Amino acid sequence: MSLFALGLNHKSAPVNIREQIVFAPDAVTAALQHLRAHTTAREAAILSTCNRTELYVRMDDRAPEMLGEWLARYHRLDPEWLRDYLYLHEGAGAVRHLMRVSAGLDSLVLGEPQILGQAKIAYQGAIDAGTMGRVLDRLFQHAFSVAKQVRTDTGIGANPVSVAFAAVTLARQIFDDFQNRTALLIGAGETIELVARHLREQGLKNLIVANRNLERARQLVELEGGEAIPLSEIPTRLPEADVLVASTASPLPILGKGTVERAVRKRRHRPMFMLDLAVPRDIEPEAGNLDDVYLYTVDDLREVIAENRRSREEAAHQAEEIVQRQVDQFLSWRRAQQAVASICDFRERGHAHARELLQRANRRLRCGEPPERVLAWLSHTLTNRLLHAPTVGLREAAEAGDRERIELARTLLQIENANEDTRESVDKEQTGTTQGAARGDQRSTG
């Protein structure tokens, strides 16, 4: 069984591809159970955000191609078409990838803290679905520890440039100031809350928040000021908006081209800045073809964010060192767990031989055979049983000239160097014991 991380993100696939591979929060449990039922996955978790969709799986190491095919078919897509956008990490690579993701080192905004919360949601989702096992549990706990240590021990979180801040920076390319502007924010999650805060800090006075859950919108405007409205009122209030930012979890667009076109006419073609941070998108892409509409997606924030990444390169280097240490620690634990399983199997095989031979020895004693002879037979036969496999392995290694395997066996079996006389003595003793035991065996069976 190996660990795999398969997925696509903002670097491997544009938004029009990513939005087709999103798992809605209420669909994760069913998806994980379907994944385990239709592949060789033993443990699984799904991390799905606007910038990435990833599967973390412990499964048969001969079948990782199952994951890409399952992901495509689950979303009713062609596996061959999707393959060009996917990446696959195995073993240590999968461990390192989750740790880097959780620490914000693989994010669009380097060091952004939101991804850690999203990773914790993925972890809880696997627990709820019953697909979180001992190995993945340990891996996620290590990843959370890495994220905390990176933020504590490096400067990667200092003066952060969030997606929300980058959104407001992009809007300033259209409007010099926000004092006399109106912003319509669709959604009421953490990103929208941060956008509202940054807009207020830039002097925006008129703020409208639309959300499916009106109470949540009201809670947000209580913090930042403004007016809360239901989604149904968006078409009538849209003409007021100079700035529109959308970030919901809706599976279908909330704003169509026709609605935007009518709003632009009512605005008498005053420019409208629109930023769609959602994946799948909240605004029909065709709306961007309208005159006076400046429509951007989350992928358009790259240049704004690039400066942030350059300023944090030293902190990122320190963070990568922390990640590598934690990767080594996890892999050490993993190897120890695999050794424990081998030790248990090895000891159980020895006990099974002992139980079988003890039963046979008792039968011989009941038949009146001298105890000394039975004990000699038991000792010899049990020794042969236990040493047969190592002996065959050593002989094969010797015939192949594999000195490394021979030395490893000597270390594992704690074999001291013996001179030739000792070896000959041991050989003679074993030969005599073998012959005596064989004669006893023949008499007992006869």
Swiss-Prot record:
Reaction catalysed by this enzyme: (S)-4-amino-5-oxopentanoate + tRNA(Glu) + NADP(+) = L-glutamyl-tRNA(Glu) + NADPH + H(+)
Residues given in the record as NADP(+) binding sites: G187, A188, G189, E190, T191, I192
Region annotated Disordered, chain positions: 417-446
CDD domains: NAD_bind_Glutamyl_tRNA_reduct
UniProt GO BP: protoporphyrinogen IX biosynthetic process from glutamate
EC number: 1.2.1.70
The protein's annotated pathway: Porphyrin-containing compound metabolism; protoporphyrin-IX biosynthesis; 5-aminolevulinate from L-glutamyl-tRNA(Glu): step 1/2
Pfam families in the cross-refs: GlutR_dimer (PF00745), GlutR_N (PF05201), Shikimate_DH (PF01488)
Compositional bias (Basic and acidic residues): 420-430
Keyword Transcription: no
Keywords: NADP, Oxidoreductase, Porphyrin biosynthesis
A molecular function (GO) term: NADP binding
Active-site residues, as the UniProt record annotates them: C50
Matches recorded under InterPro entries: 4pyrrol_synth_GluRdtase, 4pyrrol_synth_GluRdtase_dimer, 4pyrrol_synth_GluRdtase_N, GluRdtase_dimer_dom_sf, GluRdtase_N_sf, NAD(P)-bd_dom_sf, Shikm_DH/Glu-tRNA_Rdtase
Site (Important for activity): H97
Positions with a binding annotation for substrate: T49, C50, N51, R52, S107, E112, P113, Q114, Q118
Class in the EC hierarchy, top level: oxidoreductase
Miscellaneous comment as given in the Swiss-Prot or TrEMBL entry: During catalysis, the active site Cys acts as a nucleophile attacking the alpha-carbonyl group of tRNA-bound glutamate with the formation of a thioester intermediate between enzyme and glutamate, and the concomitant release of tRNA(Glu). The thioester intermediate is finally reduced by direct hydride transfer from NADPH, to form the product GSA.
Function recorded in the entry: Catalyzes the NADPH-dependent reduction of glutamyl-tRNA(Glu) to glutamate 1-semialdehyde (GSA).
Record text on subunit structure and interactions: Homodimer.
Free-text comment about domains: Possesses an unusual extended V-shaped dimeric structure with each monomer consisting of three distinct domains arranged along a curved 'spinal' alpha-helix. The N-terminal catalytic domain specifically recognizes the glutamate moiety of the substrate. The second domain is the NADPH-binding domain, and the third C-terminal domain is responsible for dimerization.
Family: Belongs to the glutamyl-tRNA reductase family.
Protein known as: Glutamyl-tRNA reductase
Gene: hemA
